[in-house]
Amino acid sequence: MGVLLTTGPTSPSRAASDASPPSPWVVRWSRLVAPGGTVLDVACGGGRHLGWFHARGHRVTGVDRSAEALRALAPLARAGAEIVKADLEDGPWPFAARTFDAVVVTNYLWRPLFPTIVAALAPGGVLICETFAAGNETVGRPARADFLLRPGELLTVCDDLHVVAYENGFLEAPARFVQRVAALRPKAEDASGIATGPPRHLLQTLSSDAVSAPMPRTGAR
């Protein structure tokens, strides 16, 4: 995490979030997380999402195997964030029997962990996941198939969840192929045994200006 220069006091969550901005996908679907709910950031790195959720009143937990990355999160830890050092690929899951209102995974892929991540969602909890996808080998790293999602793979991972949004495509600046999903674990039936009805998760729509804007011209006549 880079050095943050300020002219006044800075909160721990502000320092973490200012070092690197959160993913727009995470920001967009964070509204599915219950107010004040618990958030687990898997392979949290420098804590860009931990800081962002912490600043908005969520109880946050971050896990990563990099001691260097976690040392940078000391201010967040002092402010109440739970920071865990663990090797998720060569060790036990450190949150056995615990569930979270949201699990965030970005730019990280370890396929054997997917069932555990899904199981860590509390009823009504949301999985917000975004990482590199097949095609990225044509523009940069990662390029190995082990680190790239196959077409539709996240939909298979979320087979038992309610998928609210899914995208698989190309982004610019920097050029990369990504796949991403926002999916909810269904809530249990209420005490009377009657289901609460289908959830109503508002989707974003284009503004009228965007719809009416002329298409850019490509090539010469």
Language-model features: where?
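S-adenosyl-L-methionine
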Residues: 2-34
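Conserved class I S-adenosyl-L-methionine
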Residues: 37-45
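Conserved SAM-binding loop of SAM-dependent methyltransferases across substrates and taxa
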Residues: 46-56
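Conserved SAM/SAH-binding beta-strand->alpha-helix loop
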Residues: 66-68
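Conserved SAM-binding strand-loop segment of SAM-dependent methyltransferases
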Residues: 78-90
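A short acidic, Gly/Pro-enriched loop at the edge of an enzyme's catalytic core
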Residues: 93-102
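Conserved beta-strand signature within the Rossmann-like core of class I S-adenosyl-L-methionine
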Residues: 125-132
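Core SAM-dependent methyltransferase catalytic element
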Residues: 171-221
